[in-house]
C-alpha cells in the first residue's frame, strides 16, 4: 500500500484499465473507477490520499458463501463508511459473485513461413532430373495418385517433394553434392547436343527416337491443296514470266519491260519465301515453342512485303527516273507486246486461282471476301492475290505506256510507265506490311464469336460469371481463349457429394468429437473438393474445344 500512496497522479492515470467511470456517493470523494478485478478510488485534494484495491478470484467460493476478495476488503469498506457522518453504516457496492469467463475453442493458427514446400508434389521425371536419382531410388518412396492435367491421359503418380529431397540427401549426402552432380550432367547433356548437331542425319534419327510421336504433315500433301497449291502455281508462272520479260528487255531496252521483269522476279522470290513459311508453320510444337510455329506464315508474308518494296518498287523507280533524265531510243516493241500478252494471260490465271481459294475459305469462315482479305486470315494466299492483282494492273499500265511511246516516238511515256508500276508495287507492299504486322501483334477474333464462346461457358450450371475474356487469332484458323471464371461453390460441392457414399460421410461426421477430428475431416474433403474444381475446369475446356474446333488453346482461371 505504501507504494501506491507514493505514486504520483499522472502515473496512476496511466494504468491500463477497462473501466466505466461512476460517481462515488461518499463524502469528499470525487471519482471512483471500477473494473472487474480492480476498484480504484480517486480522493479529492482536501482529503488525505487513500486507495482501496479489491481483488476478485475466479476460484470456487468457500463454504460460508464468502470469497477471498470480500474478506480482504471488509476492513477498508468499514473505514470508508465512517467518513460520512449522516450514514453510520455504508454497505459494500462490490458484487459478491465470482467472475464467469467463457472461453471460445479455436484451432491454433499454423505459421507456414514465407517458403513452405513440404506439401509440394513432383513427378518422377523431375525427381530423376532435379535430384539426380535413379528409378530404383523412387521405389521405396510414398506414391500418390493425382488427377492428370492432360485431357487424354488418366491419373498419374507423383511424390512428395520432401520425401524426394530426403532420399536425395541420403544418396548424395549434401545439397552441394547434388548441385555438383546436376552440373556435371548438364555439361554432359550440352556435349551430347553438340555432337548431335555435327551430324544432321544422326540429329534427325535422334529426334525421332526421343519421342516426337505426333505424325508430321507430309510436305507433298501440304502443297497439293489450299494456300500451298496457290503458292506453288504462282512460283512456276512468275518464274517463266521473269525469264521471258528479261529476254524482251534485253532485246528492246524498254524501261517498262525492265520494271515488269523486276516485278516478276520479286514475285517469284517472295512466293518462294511464302512456301518456306508454309512448311515451317506446320512444324509440331516443342518445349521452346509450346504454341507452335503458326506465325511463320505472317513473318514470311511480312518479309515478302518488304522485299516487294525494296526490289520491285525501288528498282522500278530508279529505272524510271534514269529514263526521264537520260532518255534512250527504243527498238521495235513487237516482241515486248507478245510477251506482255502472254504474261497477262498467265498472271490472270494465277489471280483466278487465288480468288477462288480466298472465296472458298471466306465462305467457310462466314466472312465476306473483303473482310477475309483485309483481316489477313490467310496471309500466304493474300500475298499471291495482291501480287497477281498488281501484276495484271502493271501489265496493263506498261502496255499502255509502251503503246504511247510507239505512237509518238517519245521514250518519256515508257519511263512514266516504269514509275507507275513502281508506285503500284509500293502500295501493295505497304498493305502487306500493315496487315501482317497487325496479325503478329495479336488480333482479337470476331465479337460475335467471342460472345458465342462466352455464352457457352455461362450456360454451364457450375459457372456464375465470366470476366476478362481474351480471344486472339493465332493464325491458320487457330484461336487462343482465356477467361477468368467465377465458379458456384455449391454446385461444385454438390458434384463432389454425388460421387460419394453419403452414409459413409454421415458416419465420419458422427465420429467427429474434438477439434482435431473436425480438422482432419475438413482437410480430407476440402482437398477432394479442390480436385473436383480442377476437374470442372478441365471439363469446360474440353467442351469448349469440342464445340469449337478452331479453339486450340484454352486457359480458364479460377476467380
Curated annotation (Swiss-Prot):
The keyword Transferase does not apply. SUPFAM superfamilies: Cation efflux protein transmembrane domain-like, Putative DNA-binding domain. InterPro entries: Cation_efflux, Cation_efflux_TMD_sf, DNA-bd_dom_put_sf, SLC30A9, XPA_sf. This is Proton-coupled zinc antiporter SLC30A9, mitochondrial. GO terms for molecular function: antiporter activity; zinc ion transmembrane transporter activity. Residues 58-96 are annotated as: Disordered. The lineage of its organism: Eukaryota, Metazoa, Chordata, Craniata, Vertebrata. Mitochondrial proton-coupled zinc ion antiporter mediating the export of zinc from the mitochondria and involved in zinc homeostasis, zinc mobilization as well as mitochondrial morphology and health. In nucleus, may function as a secondary coactivator for nuclear receptors. One of its GO terms (cellular component) is nucleus. It is a multi-pass membrane protein. The chain crosses the membrane at residues 230-250, 305-325, 333-353, 389-409, 415-435. Keywords: Antiport, Endoplasmic reticulum, Ion transport, Membrane, Mitochondrion, Nucleus, Transcription, Transcription regulation, Transmembrane, Transmembrane helix, Transport, Zinc, Zinc transport. Pfam families: Cation_efflux. Belongs to the cation diffusion facilitator (CDF) transporter (TC 2.A.4) family. SLC30A subfamily. It comes from Xenopus laevis (African clawed frog).
Amino acid at each position: 500500500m505504501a507504494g501506491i500512496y507514493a505514486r504520483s497522479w499522472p502515473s496512476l492515470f496511466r494504468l491500463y484499465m477497462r473501466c466505466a467511470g461512476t460517481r462515488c456517493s461518499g463524502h469528499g470523494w470525487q471519482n471512483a473507477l471500477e473494473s472487474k478485478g480492480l476498484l480504484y478510488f480517486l480522493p479529492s485534494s482536501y482529503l488525505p490520499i487513500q486507495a482501496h484495491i479489491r481483488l476478485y478470484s475466479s476460484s470456487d467460493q468457500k463454504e460460508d458463501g464468502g470469497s477471498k476478495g470480500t474478506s480482504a476488503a471488509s476492513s477498508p469498506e468499514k473505514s470508508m463508511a465512517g467518513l460520512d457522518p449522516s450514514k453510520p453504516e455504508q454497505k459494500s457496492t462490490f458484487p459478491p459473485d465470482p467472475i464467469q469467463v467463457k472461453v471460445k475453442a479455436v484451432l491454433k493458427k499454423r505459421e507456414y513461413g514465407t517458403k513452405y514446400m513440404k506439401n509440394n508434389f513432383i513427378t518422377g521425371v523431375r525427381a530423376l532430373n532435379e535430384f539426380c536419382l535413379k528409378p530404383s531410388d523412387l521405389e521405396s518412396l510414398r506414391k500418390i495418385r493425382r488427377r492428370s492435367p492432360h485431357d487424354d491421359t488418366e491419373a498419374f503418380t507423383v511424390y512428395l517433394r520432401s520425401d524426394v529431397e530426403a532420399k536425395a540427401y541420403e544418396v548424395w549426402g549434401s545439397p552441394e553434392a547434388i548441385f555438383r552432380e546436376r552440373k556435371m550432367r548438364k555439361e554432359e547433356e550440352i556435349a551430347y547436343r553438340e555432337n548431335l548437331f555435327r551430324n544432321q542425319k544422326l540429329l534427325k534419327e535422334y529426334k525421332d527416337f526421343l519421342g516426337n510421336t505426333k505424325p508430321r504433315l507430309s510436305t507433298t500433301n501440304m502443297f497439293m491443296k489450299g494456300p500451298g497449291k496457290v503458292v506453288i502455281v504462282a512460283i512456276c508462272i512468275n518464274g517463266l514470266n521473269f525469264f521471258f520479260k528479261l529476254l524482251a528487255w534485253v532485246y528492246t531496252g524498254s524501261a517498262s519491260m525492265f520494271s515488269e521483269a523486276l516485278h516478276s522476279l520479286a514475285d517469284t522470290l517472295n512466293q518462294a519465301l511464302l512456301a518456306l513459311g508454309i512448311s515451317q508453320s506446320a512444324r509440331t510444337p516443342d518445349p521452346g515453342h509450346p504454341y507452335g510455329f503458326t506465325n511463320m506464315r505472317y513473318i514470311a508474308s511480312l518479309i515478302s512485303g518488304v522485299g516487294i518494296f525494296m526490289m520491285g518498287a525501288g528498282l522500278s523507280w530508279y529505272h524510271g527516273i534514269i529514263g526521264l533524265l537520260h532518255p534512250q531510243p527504243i527498238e521495235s516493241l513487237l516482241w515486248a507486246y507478245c510477251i506482255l500478252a502472254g504474261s497477262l494471260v498467265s498472271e490472270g490465271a494465277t489471280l483466278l486461282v487465288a480468288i477462288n481459294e480466298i472465296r472458298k475459305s471466306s465462305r467457310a469462315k462466314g466472312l465476306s471476301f473483303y473482310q477475309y482479305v483485309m483481316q489477313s486470315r490467310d496471309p500466304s494466299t493474300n500475298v499471291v492475290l495482291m501480287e497477281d492483282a498488281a501484276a495484271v494492273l502493271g501489265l496493263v499500265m506498261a502496255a499502255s505506256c509502251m503503246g504511247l511511246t510507239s505512237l509518238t516516238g517519245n521514250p518519256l511515256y515508257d519511263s512514266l510507265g516504269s514509275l507507275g508500276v513502281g508506285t503500284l508495287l509500293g502500295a501493295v507492299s505497304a498493305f502487306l506490311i500493315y496487315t501482317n504486322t497487325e496479325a503478329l501483334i495479336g488480333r482479337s477474333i470476331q465479337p460475335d464469336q467471342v460472345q458465342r464462346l462466352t455464352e457457352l461457358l455461362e450456360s454451364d450450371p457450375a459457372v456464375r460469371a465470366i470476366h476478362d475474356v481474351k480471344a486472339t487469332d493465332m493464325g491458320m484458323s487457330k484461336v487462343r481463349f482465356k477467361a477468368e471464371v467465377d465458379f458456384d461453390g455449391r454446385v461444385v460441392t454438390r458434384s463432389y457429394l454425388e460421387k460419394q457414399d453419403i452414409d459413409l460421410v454421415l458416419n465420419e461426421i458422427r465420429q467427429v468429437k474434438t477439434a482435431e477430428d473436425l480438422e482432419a475431416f475438413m482437410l480430407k474433403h476440402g482437398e477432394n473438393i479442390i480436385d473436383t474444381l480442377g476437374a470442372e475446369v478441365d471439363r469446360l475446356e474440353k467442351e469448349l474445344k469440342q464445340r469449337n474446333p478452331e479453339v486450340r488453346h484454352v486457359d480458364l482461371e479460377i476467380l
